[in-house]
Structure formats: structure tokens, C-alpha cells
């Protein structure tokens, strides 16, 4: 018996299969000391694991360490640029905390790292930027550091070129000579529409869940797809089946021609897609 499939397009977003451009920015300024000094630190293995999980062999990737440019060195510093899925642990193990002079650790400039990545290795083309940081915003920071941190938050929240931002808070107790830390933050920034689609695909396919066991916090956008509709049935017909397509963008009604009704009364649940975190420093 012939059936009719009626589809209602909920969104024009489609899954992509072409190569993705991805950058991995690793903070190595002073506040990161315990992540580099603690012999039990899983910081570098984590980064390597993320790269191996989210990067496809044909992806274009760039791996950089960043702090803030100073008289001794420019930031960010690229340690690898090329095809994806390359084992990076040996390259990461060679990285250490940066200094701004003979006695003091380097400061941090997130905006410099992001903008430099977009304009140089990305050549202003769409891509996903991963940031590995302790997210330290200490009350003891000087006014310039506080201003730079605020500038970064403004960049990721207000700049329309950054389409999507996810945050993955992770526990990782580490101790260094001068500083201790209880955990870190991994950000995923989608620069441009193509990167937003690629990042969505990484989440929806379950690929990201292979390395991050908890659902990410959505920082941006806060006004797009906040809820998901989950069809439960058709109220006025027991023979019509309602479902969503695999990408959750198309509403599908499965019915026989002789049982077509002039009006479909859909019953559905609404799922809140925001995942709240209460993060204690």
C-alpha cells in the first residue's frame, strides 16, 4: 500500500561533509603554571584527545600556544599547521609556561589570540576555534588584565562574526610552584555560518560526547533554537505517525492516501536545550 510522506521544513540547516578548518589555542601564560608543572596533570593529554576526536584527516588544523605578545615573543605561536588527526602529544609535551621578562610569567590576551587566528591561519575564512584555559579572572588582576578579559567576553558575545559559543567546564585539580587550580574551561567558538553548522554537526552526531562526557553550556546564541519540539502523535488521527528527521530540522507525517485529513492536530513536547552550570572557582 502506497504511503505519503509529508515533510515540513523547520530550518534550512543541512549536515555538511566537507573538510572543516579548526584551530586549537592553548593558554601558556602565568595562571596556567600548575597545568604545566603538576606531574599528574592531564591537561596536555586532554588537548591531544580533543584534537584526535573532533578533527577529521582532511580537516585543516592549526595548533597554537598563546599568552600576550611582549618583547620576548609574539603570541599566539603556531606549533603545528596542516592536516587533521595528527598525534600531537609529543608536540604538546614540549610546551612550557611563557615569560614576559627574565623574572615574570607572561600575561594573557584572549582577543589577540582569537583575532590573530582568524586573520592569519584562517585567512578570515570560517572555522572552529577551540580555547583551552583556566578561565582565571582573579580579583588580584591589574586593571589592564581585567580590561582585556572584558574585551574578550564582549568579542564572543557581541561580535556577529562569532555565530556560536560552547563552553565545557572540566574538573582537573593541579598544583604548581606558585598557583593551584581546580579545573579548566574549554571553549568552542564558531567563526562564520559554515563553522556553526560544523560545530552543530559535531554535537548532534555524538562525536564531541566521546571526549566530553557532560553536555556543554551554550553561551551563544541565546535566542536561537532554545527549545526543541518532540512529536508525540496526532490527536485527531491514530493512523498518522509524526516524527522528526535525523537532523531535527524537518517535521515528517507518515500517512496513507485514503486516510488524509484536512487538518492535523499535532501533540508534542517541548525540550529545553539550555544546560545550566553553576561553576565554583
Language-model features, listed with the residues they occupy:
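Gram-negative bacterial Sec-dependent N-terminal signal peptides
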Residues: 1-19
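…and closely analogous acidic/polar surface helices at protein-protein or active-site interfaces
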Residues: 20-22, 30-62, 143-157
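Residues that scaffold, gate, or flank divalent-cation-dependent active/transport sites
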Residues: 27
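Von Willebrand factor
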Residues: 73, 78-133, 137-138, 167-173
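VWA/integrin I-like adhesion module and closely mimicked acidic/polar interface patches used
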Residues: 136-191
Amino acid at each position: 500500500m502506497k504511503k505519503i510522506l509529508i515533510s515540513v521544513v523547520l530550518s534550512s540547516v543541512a549536515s555538511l561533509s566537507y573538510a572543516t578548518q579548526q584551530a586549537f589555542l592553548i593558554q601558556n601564560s602565568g595562571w596556567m603554571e600548575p597545568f604545566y608543572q603538576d606531574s599528574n596533570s592531564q591537561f596536555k593529554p586532554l588537548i591531544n584527545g580533543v584534537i584526535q576526536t573532533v578533527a577529521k584527516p582532511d580537516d585543516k588544523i592549526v595548533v597554537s600556544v598563546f599568552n600576550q605578545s611582549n618583547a620576548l615573543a609574539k603570541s599566539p605561536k603556531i606549533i603545528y599547521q596542516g592536516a587533521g588527526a595528527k598525534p600531537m602529544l609529543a608536540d604538546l609535551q614540549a610546551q612550557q609556561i611563557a615569560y614576559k621578562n627574565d623574572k615574570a610569567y607572561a600575561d594573557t590576551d584572549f582577543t589577540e589570540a582569537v583575532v590573530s587566528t582568524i586573520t592569519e591561519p584562517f585567512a578570515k575564512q570560517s572555522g572552529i576555534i577551540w580555547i583551552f584555559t583556566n578561565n582565571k579572572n582573579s580579583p588580584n588582576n591589574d586593571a589592564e588584565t581585567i580590561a582585556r578579559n572584558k574585551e574578550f567576553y564582549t568579542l564572543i558575545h557581541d561580535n556577529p562574526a562569532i555565530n556560536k559559543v560552547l563552553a565545557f567546564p572540566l574538573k582537573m585539580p593541579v598544583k604548581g610552584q606558585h598557583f593551584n587550580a581546580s579545573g579548566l574551561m574549554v571553549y568552542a567558538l564558531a567563526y562564520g555560518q559554515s563553522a556553526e553548522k560544523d560545530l552543530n554537526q559535531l554535537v548532534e552526531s555524538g562525536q564531541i560526547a566521546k571526549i566530553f562526557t557532560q553536555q556543554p553550556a551554550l553561551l551563544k546564541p541565546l535566542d536561537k533554537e532554545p527549545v526543541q519540539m518532540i512529536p508525540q502523535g496526532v490527536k485527531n488521527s491514530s493512523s498518522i505517525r509524526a516524527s522528526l528527521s535525523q537532523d531535527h530540522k524537518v517535521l515528517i507525517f507518515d500517512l496513507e492516501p485514503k486516510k488524509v485529513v484536512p487538518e492535523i492536530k499535532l501533540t508534542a513536547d517541548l525540550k529545553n536545550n539550555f544546560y545550566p552550570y553553576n561553576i565554583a572557582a
